[in-house]
Amino acid sequence: EYCWFIDPIDGTRSFVSGVPLWGTLIGLEYNTKPSFGVIDHPCLDERYIAIDGKAFLIKNGKSDILRTSNCQSLNEARLGFTSYDMFKTRNDQLIFDSIYDQVKITRSGGDCYFYSLLASGHMDIIIESSLQPYDIVAIIPLIEAAGGFISSWDGGSPNRGGSIVASASQDLHSQAIDILKNFK
């Protein structure tokens, strides 16, 4: 059974503020497994596509294969997140802070563009909370096809949203999951 997930404007605050990092997300699940994903950034003329286990960036009529970075450790990682206020509970804030305090560089306000940066090797880890399925189904195949890892904070399936961690490498992902699980 096929199911489409479409978010026409992921990053509504960016969109209404004129920040060009918003995007359109189109994801397809087959038998509840995300199998195809597109993140389109029309203001940047960038389209990130995952299909058949491959991830591509299409820009200016050219296609480039995507690959996550080789970052292996939190203390060398570039962390992205949309907004601190997405961590609704004090416990979620403490969990997020425990990773935030360990990374090399932090950036916020990137919406779905940070996932595009992760897939292309320019961001190493993304931690978010309060996501809906339409926020993440298109992103899952992109991160995985580019060589990254994505899960819920407890290491489970990210398909239904909630609290998500996406990482460039398995070692980095394992370090983050170990910290995130210790707070639960």
Predicted features and spans:
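Residue-level signal for pocket-adjacent positions within structured domains
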Residues: 10, 23, 43, 61-62, ...
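DPxDG-like acidic metal-binding loop motif
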Residues: 1-56
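A broadly tuned "polar low-complexity/structure-edge" signature
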Residues: 12, 51-57, 71, 126, ...
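Short loop segments at secondary-structure junctions
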Residues: 29-33, 43, 52-55, 60-62, ...
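Short, surface-exposed linear segments at secondary-structure transitions and domain or protein termini
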Residues: 24, 56-60, 74-76
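An extended, acidic
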Residues: 67-184
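Short amphipathic beta-strand/extended segments with alternating polar/hydrophobic composition
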Residues: 40, 50-51, 62-72, 177
